[in-house]
């Protein structure tokens, strides 16, 4: 069986299911043992800094203004490290992503500790784009089944489905989405214009590979939404990362055609997420490194910023 096709060529074209699974329609993160969250000082009008002007943000689980953070990848992260992040900034964190296959390097009990801790703070937990590696196994259908079952048993909420390194038929991509939803998990496709994105490839090599037409993202995005996908991740390579000049035209084109709440942008640099907040406001969904959560949250709240955003990021929520 070809590594780039899950099903035989004779299989009929994919069609959207008549009934979207419950997994595809529930909030990203559901936990019955949430910690009681103390109000942050900025929202405490009686004893804190609530008298300072700031932007009103929706409570979790949010569908707009979502912030997903990268967990262990550039640095190791255990329970104590994550506890520090969530005890201080958990109010601002919506999702935790284990980049690539980083989660496979953990002892199972330690990985579950991180996942369970995230859930206590109403933070959903997502895999990285390891599905690409799973599809390269000699029997990809069996491997995908085993992968999803194990991820569910570990406590993951969201399965990222990337294809930055693979050429895969669009219908097969949608079949994987259906399979993820059928397992009671949430599919989060990752799309981009740069082939070879999502790894540690040098910028010069990425440039030589060329880019795809942005209309491909838009076409697939619409099909994913029809399949019940709640949110699509947009890869930064080729758009705002490893490029001589940002492809803001691609971003604008995506948001002209796809609902903003259905899209999340990877923002790998403070200048990038500063631009997203400036251009699209506090409700834009962003994926950043966990080390950047404070800086991004200051921007969303409208209490700090760079020269072009300081004191100018506002919303109106009567």
Task: Name each model-derived stretch.
Residues 64-71, 94-98, 125-129, 159-161, ...:
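Hydrophobic faces of well-ordered beta-strands that scaffold small-molecule active sites
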Residues 104-115, 136-145, 165-185, 195-199, ...:
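Active-site-adjacent beta->alpha loops and helix N-cap segments on the catalytic face
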Residues 1-40:
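N-terminal mitochondrial targeting presequence
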Residues 158-239:
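Conserved anion-binding
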Residues 41-58, 255-318:
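C-terminal alpha-helical cap/extension of soluble enzyme domains
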